[in-house]
């Protein structure tokens, strides 16, 4: 997405919010999406990027949705916005074996980032949460890092992504087996080598020896009980539970307004990070 501009004074930060919406080919009764993004209260530029669109792929309608939460710059997140879905769909077996195609594309995309000699890709990194909806029926969700995917079914929240926390036993063991370590300093979150607060990312060349970009992948069959999908950056999940986000979104049939209200609630709860939310409503 384009960078979101902001004006600053000595006493106040004024940020611009970006929102939009769209729908699948089924029109009024079909699947609709909306998104809302707003820059956080930090001094750096907006580092969250997103994808939200429907496209035709070999006669199938695909909904492509993603949030990429960058750190140490927005370059890796911007690269993912441009390349990750295209790399997934380049695989000739995508419709036959989506899980394998997604996992392979995540790995290959990260390798291309790490091999790139551009200086703007040297130091930064990004989380990713992606969702691919095939013909309105099959939903494939993948993630690395701590951006979340939440499905509401009959008003109940179910997290469909995994937060890759360095202090998780499995993640810590992986890091330590590669020669890294996890710090637990008072007043701070666990960090890889004292630096990074997630254990799986794209990029981060200086820490890659201790990390990986292997995604968690889950599939969901959309049925009459499936209400909507929320994709959210950690600017939301740090201050709201999954059920709280669902409770806000389910009050609004318009997915753009639902996304805006989730963002507004995160701001109300004093979230300081960049905040991004996509809502895909199935019924």
Swiss-Prot record:
Record keywords, A-Z: Hydrolase, Magnesium, Manganese, Metal-binding, Protein phosphatase
Domain PPM-type phosphatase, chain residue ranges per copy: 32-282
Superkingdom, taxonomy of origin: Eukaryota
Pfam families: PP2C
Gene Ontology MF annotations: metal ion binding; protein serine/threonine phosphatase activity
Claim: Iron is one of the keywords in the record: no
Cofactor: Mg(2+); Mn(2+)
Major enzyme class: hydrolase
Co-factor binding details: Binds 2 magnesium or manganese ions per subunit.
Binding locations of Mn(2+) 1: 69-70
GO cellular component labels: plasma membrane
EC number, UniProt record: 3.1.3.16
UniProt entry tagged with the keyword Glycoprotein: no
Sequence positions that bind Mn(2+) 2: 69, 234, 273
Catalytic activity: O-phospho-L-seryl-[protein] + H2O = L-seryl-[protein] + phosphate; O-phospho-L-threonyl-[protein] + H2O = L-threonyl-[protein] + phosphate
Family classification: Belongs to the PP2C family.
PANTHER family named among the record's database cross-references: PROTEIN PHOSPHATASE
Name this polypeptide is given: Probable protein phosphatase 2C 17
Organism whose genome encodes this protein: Arabidopsis thaliana
């Amino acid at each position: 997405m384009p960078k979101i501009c902001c004006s600053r004074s000595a006493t106040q930060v004024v940020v611009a919010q970006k929102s939009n919406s769209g729908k699948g080919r089924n029109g009024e009764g079909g699947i609709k999406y909306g998104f809302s993004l707003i820059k956080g209260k930090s001094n750096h530029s907006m580092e969250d990027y997103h994808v939200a669109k429907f496209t035709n792929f070999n006669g199938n309608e695909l909904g492509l949705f993603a949030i990429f939460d960058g750190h140490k710059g927005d370059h890796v997140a911007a690269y993912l916005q441009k390349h990750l879905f295209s790399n997934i769909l380049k695989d000739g077996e995508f419709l036959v074996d989506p899980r394998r195609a997604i996992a392979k594309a995540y790995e290959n995309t990260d390798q291309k980032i790490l091999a790139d000699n551009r200086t703007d890709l040297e130091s930064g990194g990004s989380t990713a949460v992606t969702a691919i909806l095939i013909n309105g029926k099959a939903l494939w969700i993948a993630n690395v890092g701590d951006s979340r995917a939440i499905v509401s079914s009959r008003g109940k929240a179910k997290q469909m992504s995994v937060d890759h926390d360095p202090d998780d036993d499995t993640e810590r063991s992986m890091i330590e087996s590669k020669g890294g370590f996890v710090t637990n300093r008072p007043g701070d979150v666990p960090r890889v080598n004292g630096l990074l607060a997630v254990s799986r990312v794209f990029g981060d060349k200086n820490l890659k020896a201790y990390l990986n970009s292997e995604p968690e992948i889950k599939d969901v069959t959309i049925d009459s009980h499936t209400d909507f999908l929320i994709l959210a950056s950690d600017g939301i999940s740090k201050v709201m539970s999954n059920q709280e986000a669902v409770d806000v979104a389910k009050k609004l049939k318009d997915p753009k307004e639902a996304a805006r209200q989730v963002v507004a609630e995160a701001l109300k709860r004093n979230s300081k990070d960049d905040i991004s939310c996509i809502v895909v409503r199935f019924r």
